[in-house]
C-alpha cells in the first residue's frame, strides 16, 4: 500500500508542520501525494481554516479539501475516543483502517500521508492506540519529535514500541520546539541511539525546505509515486 504513517512522540510537537513541508517538497518533485487524517479532535467548525486539516489542504493546493482529508472531526481537545463519545459517537478502528486503505488505493502509485492524532501510544478507541492502526495498515512510519529537553527519552521510548511491533521506521524528524535547546545539539546527542534510522531536522517556520526528507522517502518508501492519480 503506498502510504506513510506520520506519527509523533506526543501531541503538538510538529507533525502537521512536517507533513505540510513534505507535501510541498513532494509536489515540487512531481510526485503524486495526498493526505488523510483518520480522526481529529479539538476541531472548531467556526475556525476550520485554522485547523491541521486545513493546513494540509492548503499544502496540497486544495483549500476546500478539509472535510475530505479529515472525515471524523470532533470539537473537544481530548483524545479522539473521548471527544467522539461527547458527541454521541464511538470510534471503530477497523472503519478508520478501511478508509485509509481505500484512500491509498485511489492514488494507485502515489503516496498517501496518513497523519495520526497525538503520539504513537495515544488512544484512538477505548482499547486501541495509534500503534494498533499503524500495525493494521502495515505502513512504514515517519516519527516526528520536538527538540525540547527530554525529547531523546521520548523518541527512544517511541522507537522501542514501534520496533517491538515490527513497524518499519522510515525516518525520524526533530521538529524545532519553542525555547528549546539548540536543534543541532539535540540531533547530535540523539543520533547515536537511533540504530540506523535516518534523522532529519525541521526548523520552525514555513521557509523550511523538506527536500532532503522528500528525496529519502521517495527512494525508500514510494519509488513509484510519480505515476499515481491526483
Curated annotation (Swiss-Prot):
Its cofactor is Mg(2+). The active site is at residue 37. It catalyses: (7R,8S)-7,8-diammoniononanoate + CO2 + ATP = (4R,5S)-dethiobiotin + ADP + phosphate + 3 H(+). ATP binds at residues 12-17, 52, 115-118, 175-176. It comes from Caulobacter sp. (strain K31). It is found in: Cytoplasm. Keywords: ATP-binding, Biotin biosynthesis, Cytoplasm, Ligase, Magnesium, Metal-binding, Nucleotide-binding. Substrate binds at residue 41. Pathway: Cofactor biosynthesis; biotin biosynthesis; biotin from 7,8-diaminononanoate: step 1/2. This is ATP-dependent dethiobiotin synthetase BioD. SUPFAM superfamilies: P-loop containing nucleoside triphosphate hydrolases. Belongs to the dethiobiotin synthetase family. Its EC number is 6.3.3.3. Homodimer. Gene3D superfamilies: P-loop containing nucleotide triphosphate hydrolases. GO terms for molecular function: ATP binding; dethiobiotin synthase activity; magnesium ion binding. GO terms for cellular component: cytosol.
